[in-house]
């Protein structure tokens, strides 16, 4: 239906400018706008001899012939008509001659011209234009003069009828622009409708092709030649701008010249040197740019080099490796150039960009008269009419025409033109009126429009399609109508009027929009090519009325990849951007993700990834030799593309290997019959048959000669092999010797012992230690910060106090509420308001308020001080942070250094290979094992040479580092090390002459022999060069060292034995005194003669050096040992003194206890005599019986306690001995006080007693028991109570002398003795003593004046106990009697009497005598109190007194004594014999006294410690005693 190319894409026949004829003809082979006359021109050439014969045909079938000729004779020439410069001007004369020859045909053609007035009018201006036009198109025959007038008339008539159609037609005549100045007047024949000057804007229709023809034909030819010389793919490079790419292309073309596609290295160097960059930079740029490593630059590589130069000039760093996307782009473009895949459509003035030129689109529409009429619809009608004239040809042509019909969809009005010859005009009106109706008939035959319109519905969600907004899409219909192809649109000057609005449009394309845009795309894509070219886009987008810059930006955004055309999705994106722009939205600088089509989203990235993968694979195969593996290993690289088929039967070319031995063709094999064997070669079978005997002999001789020669060669080769083997063996032996020497040097090195250490384990231990220390950093920093904050707050508070004191009249300091206690403005306002309120209140009340003079200065001073403190705090914080950072850096450095030496897989492999002999030959393995055995033997020999040094070093291993430090300063080491090292013989290579080497080897052999003799216990011969005096001195030093070591060991063992015996006996451990050297030194070993002197000298020098070093080590060790012994002796002396003092105190306490018991008995007897009633006597009798029984039990308990104390003394350690001196029997009585002292035991086991009181705690060392019974909760309390009781009792009793000086004990030195003031200690001790004496003496002391103090103390204790009695939980009714029975073991009255003294003694803590015992015993105690009258025997008496200790619940009142004993400690360990520790305190009361003693070091009242640490029973017992004591005391008085 349509004769020519796609009218909807701006083809030659279309009425729109801008289509490039060459593109159309390339794709579809459609004829040019002159396609009908063009074919007529070749017809005459083909039928030149037949003009007369064809004369009738032109008249009747002129049109058909032209059409037939167009189709059959010269279809190729029609295709070339679209290429402006393909035909040479030489054809002009031929064309003119042809025309002259065909004048008769022209006459026959006349009806055609008249019938096709539009065509004739279109050709009117071409008669004068033929000469220049021929350069761009095939020759067109000149129209005879006789038809000029008719044509002009017809042209005018057509212009009147269809001016709108005729004007745009000139766009199909690219050659019109090339008119020569002489030919320009020709258009005036058109009646002035098309003046010559406006022809220039016509270039807009061919912006990409005809730009080179804008001035003249010559220029056009030159441009053609240039474009033909250097063809550059029309591909945009993303890393440079389009403008830069255009400039680089121009520069590249000018530098390359004609016929070249690459720039030589010399030219590239000259161009790059203009950048004034240094040589290194240019070298790096060349390395990066020359991706093909060919020494030449393709255009993309040249552009890359210019881009890199620009980077360097602007101060940016050059990349070491090209980014992947740049490398892939450059390589792709280079490949296209190398394969000559170029896009000629892009040969325009701006070849770097495929974007269409919107430069003059507006002007073309504004000057419609520029375009000349071209009745192209009539051409199509003519062609179709020719079909009807030739049915057979028509069918063939109809197929072609039907194939071209989709292109004609842009011109639906042309459908009726084929049916009617004279009707091109009538069908035109329907075109503008409605395009849709005309589109449907065109699309109907193709069947494409309907399904394509529905396709967008399936696309939403793929690349941002969204539903239409609720507000709808205003003016979208108007935009669609404006954009549809229609006649006469070229004459219009489009504006945005009627399309602008302010609708709300989302970024994403709506479904409705996509449907409309797809319909637009298909309307313009008449041939269903799937894209719209740039020149068509100029026309389409220009109808929107937007400015050229906006359209250019929209094109740039929509044309992804700079292809120069838009597909369906990209066209929708461009239309959407136009629609947004019309509604007031700005054009984005970058396409948002919602508008990126799926086809272009990840295309470049995926291509780049595939390229990278291929490149990496090829590099890997090239570098690793994998490309050769199939030939070597048979590994198959065949890729399997199926999940089901294994492909086992497929031929694998990757493992193919040609067999050179295999012969492809064997004639004998081909001619064999069946399975018969291959016949023998005739030459092989008959070769020996024809030879004579002489010939055979000759051959035998020759073979013999050859055999002899072969034997000779074999012998020669064997000799050479033997020589090589011997040489290799010598070299191997030499290597073995060298390795052995090096191993010997290693073994003889002084630090060889360190090699045995497990470096990995040590490294791991160091890492753990480093990690632990590093973990402590935050904690320490936090503590430091807390301390800093506390200091700052304290300083601020101190300043407030000082300021208030210095300025008493100043206003009250303002309390700051700001951060860090800062005073804010609100605080000042509040303070002023408060002051004003106070003044007003005072004024109302008539008072007067003094306002300080420096009211304003106070806050200032506070603020300054606050700022000062804060500044100092910040400085300290910075210092802490700096310390933290430095410590972390240091730790990191240490960790890195530890990691550096860590073994890796390679080193581990090497170690296993060369140390464990894995994976080596047998000979090498044997050699390695031999070396290891020799190394072990060498270590053993070195240890034997050192003698017993190692044994002595083990006890003092901790001091080893000290000795090493002491060694280093001595200069003798360096002096002796030199001979030692030389003697080691590790420098074999240093000897040059054979004699020296022989002497050296001999020396080494002698040395090894001496070592072996020493290992066997034999005396090695004297060292060469060693005199008798030196040898004697050395041996004397060795004997002395051994003797010292033996004596030190004996002394140490003796000291341990004595200490153990002393502990078992309970006496002070004897101090081990160093024994004088009594043993005579052993006689020097007899010297064996018979060894060379030189060897003796060397051995003597080496041994002397070693002896000196060992001597220094021994001296250091001896010094440290002496110091340890001295300190141990001092400690033992102190312990002995303490034991002696403890014994004396125990004796005194025992005597005091006995006297106290006697006094209590006397008091009981007096009380019993005072009572006349029989009831009291019975009670006394019962009490006496109970006391007797209790006395027996008490005696047993005291014996047990004594044994336990002895055991404890024997097993106690030096450290804990002084702390737990009191017997455990007594300890229970003072549970609370003991705990206080026990806490201080580690520092100062013995409480720092004042001079007045001897340090009692050191009576007996019970640390062993403490260790065994540390799980007992009462252990601490009991031990301390015993200590306290002993100390308190010691004071009242004059018999025990106070200890000379407690400080002599090293443990005392460590204690906090100095912490407690002497006065507090003395008072506490006195209170404790008084309490104990009261408890011992019972009522007797209370009656005496001297015991008043004790009574007071006791009373004070009770007072404190009363306060804490609630804690005890003992029964209150029986508390008095129970206390009495517990404390005094006799009647109740004596206890009250003892407690009568109610004068509180601050120093004495409450007597918590029964910490561990349960309360039950108190009840029975009351009866015992009543029974006191019968005087129990003295032994029983003492036990009752101890009863003060809380008895175990089970025993009745009498058990009180029992309870005292058991209560003392947890029953098992506590029971200590009364004698030693004071089971003495058997009367638990002493423990109260003891309680103060522990409190002494702490300086706190003993009662407080008693409350905290003592048992509840003690407190309650004291409370009861107090009440009873008060009453009884008064009665007694």
Swiss-Prot record:
Record's compositionally biased regions (Pro residues): 1412-1495
Alphabetized UniProt keyword annotations: Actin-binding, Cell membrane, Coiled coil, Cytoplasm, Cytoskeleton, Endocytosis, Endosome, Membrane, Repeat
A biological process from GO: endosomal transport
InterPro entries (alphabetical): DUF1720, EF-hand-dom_pair, EF_hand_dom, EH_dom
Membrane topology summary: Peripheral membrane protein
Residue span(s) of domain EH: 244-333, 513-602
Cellular component GO terms held in the UniProt record: actin cortical patch; cytoplasm; endosome membrane; plasma membrane
Listed Low complexity bias regions: 19-46, 53-136, 143-170, 177-193, 345-359, 968-982, 1279-1293
Ranges where the record places region Disordered: 1-204, 345-378, 393-423, 649-691, 894-917, 935-1306, 1334-1533
A single MF term (Gene Ontology): actin binding
Domain WH2: residue ranges: 1500-1517
Coiled-coil region list: 690-890, 1026-1209
Subcellular location: Cell membrane; Endosome membrane; Cytoplasm, Cytoskeleton, Actin patch
Biased composition (Basic and acidic residues): 649-664, 894-916, 935-947, 1031-1063, 1090-1164, 1173-1203
Domain EF-hand: 277-312, 546-581
Biased composition (Acidic residues): 1204-1218, 1348-1367
Pfam family, one: EH
Biased composition (Polar residues): 360-378, 393-410, 1221-1237
Family designation: Belongs to the PAN1 family.
Role summary: Component of the PAN1 actin cytoskeleton-regulatory complex required for the internalization of endosomes during actin-coupled endocytosis. The complex links the site of endocytosis to the cell membrane-associated actin cytoskeleton. Mediates uptake of external molecules and vacuolar degradation of plasma membrane proteins. Plays a role in the proper organization of the cell membrane-associated actin cytoskeleton and promotes its destabilization.
Assembly behavior: Component of the PAN1 actin cytoskeleton-regulatory complex.
Protein's name in the database: Actin cytoskeleton-regulatory complex protein pan-1
């Amino acid at each position: 239906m349509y004769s020519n190319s796609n009218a909807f894409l701006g083809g030659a026949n279309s009425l729109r400018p801008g289509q490039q004829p060459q593109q159309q003809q390339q794709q579809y082979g459609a004829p040019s706008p002159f396609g009908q006359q063009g074919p007529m021109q070749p017809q005459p050439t083909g039928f030149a001899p037949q003009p007369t014969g064809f004369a009738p045909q032109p008249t009747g079938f002129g049109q058909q012939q032209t059409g037939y000729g167009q189709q059959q004779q010269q279809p190729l020439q029609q295709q070339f008509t679209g290429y402006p410069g393909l035909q040479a001007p030489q054809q002009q004369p031929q064309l003119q001659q042809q025309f002259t020859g065909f004048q008769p045909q022209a006459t026959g053609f006349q009806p055609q011209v008249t019938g096709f007035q539009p065509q004739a009018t279109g050709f009117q201006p071409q008669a004068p234009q033929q000469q220049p036009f021929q350069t761009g198109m095939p020759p067109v025959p000149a129209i005879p003069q006789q038809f000029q007038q008719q044509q002009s008339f017809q042209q005018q008539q057509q212009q009147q009828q269809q001016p709108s159609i005729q004007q745009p037609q000139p766009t199909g005549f690219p050659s019109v622009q090339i008119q020569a100045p002489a030919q320009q007047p020709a258009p005036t024949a058109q009646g002035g409708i098309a003046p010559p000057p406006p022809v220039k804007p016509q270039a807009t229709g061919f912006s990409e092709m005809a730009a080179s023809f804008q001035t003249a034909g010559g220029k056009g030819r030159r441009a053609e030649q240039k474009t033909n010389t250097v063809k550059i793919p029309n591909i945009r490079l993303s890393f440079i701008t389009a403008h830069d790419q255009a400039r680089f292309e121009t520069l590249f073309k000018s530098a390359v010249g004609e016929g070249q596609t690459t720039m030589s290295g010399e030219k590239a160097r000259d161009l790059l040197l203009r950048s004034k960059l240094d040589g290194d930079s240019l070298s790096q740029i060349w390395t990066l740019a020359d991706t093909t490593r060919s020494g030449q630059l393709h255009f993309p590589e040249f552009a890359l080099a210019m881009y890199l130069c620009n980077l360097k000039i602007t101060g940016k760093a050059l990349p070491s490796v090209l980014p992947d996307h740049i490398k892939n782009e450059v390589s792709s473009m280079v490949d296209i150039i190398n394969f000559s895949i170029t896009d000629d459509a892009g040969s325009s003035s701006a070849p770097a960009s495929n974007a269409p030129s919107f430069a003059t689109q507006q002007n073309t529409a504004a000057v419609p008269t520029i375009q000349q009429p071209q009745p192209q619809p009539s051409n199509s009608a003519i062609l179709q009419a020719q079909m009807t004239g030739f049915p057979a040809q028509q069918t063939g042509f109809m197929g072609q025409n039907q194939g071209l019909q989709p292109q004609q969809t842009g011109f639906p009005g042309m459908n009726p033109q084929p049916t009617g010859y004279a009707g091109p005009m009538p069908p035109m009106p329907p075109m503008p009126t409605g395009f849709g109706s005309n589109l449907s008939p065109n699309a109907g035959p193709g069947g494409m429009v309907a399904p394509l319109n529905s396709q967008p519905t399936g696309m939403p969600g793929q690349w941002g399609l969204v539903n239409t907004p609720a507000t709808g899409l205003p003016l979208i219909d108007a935009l669609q109508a404006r954009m549809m192809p229609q006649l006469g649109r070229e004459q219009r000057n489009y504006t945005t009027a009627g399309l602008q609005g302010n609708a709300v449009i989302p970024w994403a394309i709506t479904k409705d929009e996509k449907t409309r845009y797809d319909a637009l795309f298909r309307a313009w894509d008449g041939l269903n090519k799937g894209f719209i070219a740039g020149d068509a886009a100029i026309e389409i987008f220009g109808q929107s009325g937007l400015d050229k810059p906006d359209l250019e930006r929209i094109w740039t955004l929509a044309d992804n990849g700079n292809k120069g055309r838009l597909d369906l999705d990209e066209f929708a994106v461009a239309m959407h951007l136009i629609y947004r722009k019309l509604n007031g939205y700005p054009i984005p600088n970058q396409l948002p993700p919602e508008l990126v089509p799926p086809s272009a989203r990840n295309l470049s990235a995926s291509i780049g990834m595939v390229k990278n993968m291929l490149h990496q694979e090829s590099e890997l195969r090239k570098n690793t030799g994998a490309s050769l593996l199939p030939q070597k290993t048979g590994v198959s690289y065949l890729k399997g593309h199926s999940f089901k088929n294994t492909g086992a039967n497929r031929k694998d070319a990757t493992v193919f290997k040609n067999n050179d031995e295999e012969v492809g063709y064997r004639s004998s094999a081909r001619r064999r019959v069946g399975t018969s064997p291959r016949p023998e070669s005739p030459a092989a079978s008959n070769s020996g048959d024809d030879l004579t005997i002489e010939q055979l002999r000759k051959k035998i001789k020759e073979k013999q000669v050859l055999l002899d020669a072969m034997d000779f060669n074999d012998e020669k080769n064997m000799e050479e092999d033997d020589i090589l083997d011997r040489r290799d063996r010598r070299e191997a032996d030499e290597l073995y010797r060298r390795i052995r020497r090096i191993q010997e040097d290693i073994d003889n090195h002084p630090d060889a012992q360190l090699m045995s250490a497990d470096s990995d384990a040590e490294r791991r231990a160091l890492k753990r230690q480093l990690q632990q220390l590093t973990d402590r950093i935050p904690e320490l920093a936090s503590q430091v910060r807390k301390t800093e904050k506390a200091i700052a707050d304290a300083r601020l508070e101190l300043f407030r106090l000082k300021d208030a004191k210095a300025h008493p009249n100043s206003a009250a300091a303002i309390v700051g509420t700001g951060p860090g206690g800062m005073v804010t403005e609100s605080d000042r306002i509040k303070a002023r308001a408060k002051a004003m309120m106070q003044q007003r209140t005072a004024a109302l009340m008539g008072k007067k308020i003094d306002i300080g003079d420096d009211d304003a200065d106070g806050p200032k001073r506070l603020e300054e001080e606050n700022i000062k403190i804060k500044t100092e705090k910040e400085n300290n914080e910075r210092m802490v942070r700096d310390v933290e950072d430095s410590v972390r850096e240091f730790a990191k450095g240490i960790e890195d250094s530890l990691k550096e030496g860590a073994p890796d897989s390679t080193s581990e492999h090497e170690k296993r290979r060369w140390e464990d002999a894995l994976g080596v030959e047998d000979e090498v393995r044997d050699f390695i094992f031999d070396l290891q055995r020799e190394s072990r033997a060498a270590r053993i020999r070195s240890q034997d040479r050192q003698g017993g040094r190692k044994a002595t070093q083990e006890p003092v291993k901790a001091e080893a580092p000290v000795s090493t430090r002491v060694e280093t300063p001595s200069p003798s080491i360096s002096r002796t090390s030199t001979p030692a090292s030389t003697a080691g013989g590790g420098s074999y290579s240093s000897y040059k002459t054979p004699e020296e080497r022989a002497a050296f080897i001999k020396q080494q052999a002698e040395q090894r022999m001496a070592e072996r003799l020493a290992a066997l216990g034999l005396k090695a011969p004297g060292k060469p060069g060693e005199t008798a005096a030196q040898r004697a001195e050395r041996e004397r030093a060795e004997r002395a060292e051994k003797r010292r070591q033996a004596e030190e060991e004996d002394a140490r063992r003796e000291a341990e034995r004595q200490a153990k015996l002393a502990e078992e006996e309970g006496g002070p451990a004897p101090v081990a005194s160093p024994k004088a050297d009594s043993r005579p030194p052993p006689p020097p070993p007899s010297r064996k003669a018979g060894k060379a002197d030189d060897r003796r000298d060397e051995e003597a020098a080496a041994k002397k050096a070693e002896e000196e070093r060992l001597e220094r080590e021994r001296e250091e060790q001896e010094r440290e040992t002496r110091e340890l012994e001295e300190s141990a002796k001092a400690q033992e002396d102190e312990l002995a003194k303490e034991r002696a003092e403890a014994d004396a105190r125990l004796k005194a306490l025992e005597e005091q206890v006995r006297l106290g018991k006697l006094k209590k008995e006397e008091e009981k007897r007096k009380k019993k005599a005072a009572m006349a009633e029989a009831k009291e006597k019975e009670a006394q009798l019962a009490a006496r019986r109970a006391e007797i029984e209790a006395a027996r039990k008490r005696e047993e308990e005291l014996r047990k306690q004594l044994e336990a104390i002895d055991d404890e003394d024997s097993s106690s350690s030096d450290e804990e001995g002084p702390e737990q001196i009191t017997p455990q029997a007594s300890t229970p009585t003072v549970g609370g006080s003991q705990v206080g002292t026990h806490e201080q035991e580690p520092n100062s086991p013995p409480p720092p007693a004042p001079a007045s009181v001897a340090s009692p705690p050191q009576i007996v060392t019970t640390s062993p028991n403490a260790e065994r019974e540390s799980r007992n909760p009462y252990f601490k309390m009991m031990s301390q109570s015993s200590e306290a009781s002993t100390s308190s009792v010691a004071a009242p009793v004059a018999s025990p002398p106070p200890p000379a000086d407690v400080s002599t004990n090293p443990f005392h030195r460590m204690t906090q003795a100095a912490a407690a003031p002497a006065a507090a200690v003395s008072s506490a001790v006195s209170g404790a003593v008084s309490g104990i004496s009261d408890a011992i003496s019972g009522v007797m002391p209370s009656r005496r004046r001297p015991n008043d103090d004790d009574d007071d103390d006791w009373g004070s204790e009770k007072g404190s106990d009363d306060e804490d009695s609630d804690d005890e939980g003992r029964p209150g009714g029986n508390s008095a009697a129970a206390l009495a029975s517990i404390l005094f073991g006799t009647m109740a009255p004596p206890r009250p009497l003892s407690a009568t003294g109610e004068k509180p003694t601050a120093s004495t803590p409450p007597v918590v005598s029964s910490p561990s015992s349960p309360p039950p015993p108190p009840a029975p105690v009351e009866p015992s109190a009543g029974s006191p009258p019968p005087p129990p025997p003295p032994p029983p008496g003492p036990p009752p007194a101890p009863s003060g200790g809380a008895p175990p619940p089970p025993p009745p009142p009498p058990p009180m004594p029992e309870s005292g004993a058991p209560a003392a400690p947890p029953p098992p360990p506590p029971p200590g014999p009364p004698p030693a520790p004071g089971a003495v305190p058997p009367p638990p009361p002493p423990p109260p006294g003891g309680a103060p003693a522990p409190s002494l070091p702490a300086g706190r009242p003993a009662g407080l410690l008693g409350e905290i640490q003592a048992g509840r029973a003690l407190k309650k017992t004291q409370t009861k005693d107090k009440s009873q004591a008060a009453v009884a005391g008064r009665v007694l008085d």
